[in-house]
């Protein structure tokens, strides 16, 4: 299972150097695992995300608890972790939290690597040096810096008040570890982005989900498999921004938007009578109306 991970590497000049780190780099990198999952053909996310997914996961507890990005394990029936020495480790999904995007899996056999300690993403600043670490040791570790910290809204009805944007981009970003120079975990890799600095300069980088979002919900995730916060209403409408307008780019099969006969190309003018011109404003207004099941009036053009 590990062979294909050895076919590429970060150029040595872009790999982190031990002398620049206040921790044992090789030990920390051994705690980042490859993650592979299999999803049933009839799963809700199968058509968009596929039935076979691959990325990374980060060991955060000595008992084998691994943190990853949720889209890798959403609806997964089978999960495998692969260590840097090629050992395949069976695992199962513990939790997936749509609000943050985090996923948790539990290794089903003992792992020998030490967990990576959690850091404080709130204290990190633009310009700080960081390491983006995928499975595979130094060959798959990238020296980078924080390009920006700002709001992020995703068309799949996802919103972070403050995401971390790093550059350059790691080629295997999904579930990768974002480490500070003390070896602490600042976040988990989520997306490839082309506009990541404060001035929206065309720079390739990654969006990272900050680790600070995990602690408030970790107990719930371990006990219930999801956060116990009220669930946001879901529209099943994939909205996008263009030329100062917010429009419908797609609708989920069988979702509320499709059932309400909302069409691709419709322009969203207002939510519950309040004008909205960007995706973040639309989501915040929608969620302010109540929890899942609430009626959401939309004004469309």
Enumerate the language-model features and the residues they cover.
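PDZ-domain C-terminal substructure recognizer with occasional recognition of PDZ-binding tails
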Residues: 92, 219-226, 254, 260-263, ...
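C-terminal cap/linker of serine protease catalytic domains
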Residues: 1-25, 113, 139, 181, ...
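Active-site loop architecture of trypsin-fold serine endopeptidases
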Residues: 72, 76-78, 113, 133-145, ...
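Gly/Ser-enriched beta-turn/beta-hairpin loop segments
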Residues: 42-50, 94-101, 149-164, 197-198, ...
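Short, surface-exposed secondary-structure boundary micro-motifs
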Residues: 38, 71, 135-136, 191, ...
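N-terminal activation segment of mature serine protease catalytic domains
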Residues: 1-59, 65-70, 78, 125-130, ...
């Amino acid at each position: 299972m590990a062979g294909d991970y050895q076919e590429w590497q970060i150029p040595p000049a872009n790999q982190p150097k031990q002398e620049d780190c206040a921790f044992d780099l090789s030990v920390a990198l051994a705690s980042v695992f490859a993650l592979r999952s299999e999803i049933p053909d009839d799963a809700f996310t199968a058509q968009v995300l596929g039935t076979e997914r691959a990325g990374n996961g980060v060991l955060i507890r000595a008992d084998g608890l691994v943190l990853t990005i949720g889209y890798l394990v959403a609806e997964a029936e089978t999960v495998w972790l692969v260590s840097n020495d090629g050992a395949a480790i069976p695992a199962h999904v513990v939790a997936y939290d749509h609000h943050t995007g985090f996923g948790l899996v539990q290794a089903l056999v003992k792992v020998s690597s030490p967990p990576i300690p959690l850091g404080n993403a709130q204290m990190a600043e633009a310009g700080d040096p960081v390491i983006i670490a995928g499975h595979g040791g130094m060959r798959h570790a990238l020296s980078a810096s924080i390009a920006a910290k700002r709001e992020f809204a995703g068309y799949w009805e996802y919103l972070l008040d403050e995401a971390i944007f790093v550059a350059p981009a790691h080629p295997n970003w999904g579930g990768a570890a974002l480490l500070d120079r003390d070896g602490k975990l600042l976040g988990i890799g989520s997306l490839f982005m082309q506009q990541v600095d404060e001035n929206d300069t065309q720079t390739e980088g990654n969006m990272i989900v900050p680790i600070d979002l995990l602690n408030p919900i970790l107990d719930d995730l371990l006990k219930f498999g999801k956060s116990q916060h009220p669930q946001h209403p879901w529209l099943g409408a994939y909205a996008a921004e263009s030329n100062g307008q917010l429009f419908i780019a797609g609708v989920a099969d069988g979702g509320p938007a499709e059932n309400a006969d909302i069409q691709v190309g419709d322009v969203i003018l207002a939510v519950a009578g309040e004008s909205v011109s960007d995706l973040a404003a639309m989501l915040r207004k929608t969620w302010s109306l109540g929890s899942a099941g609430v009626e959401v009036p939309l004004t469309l053009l």
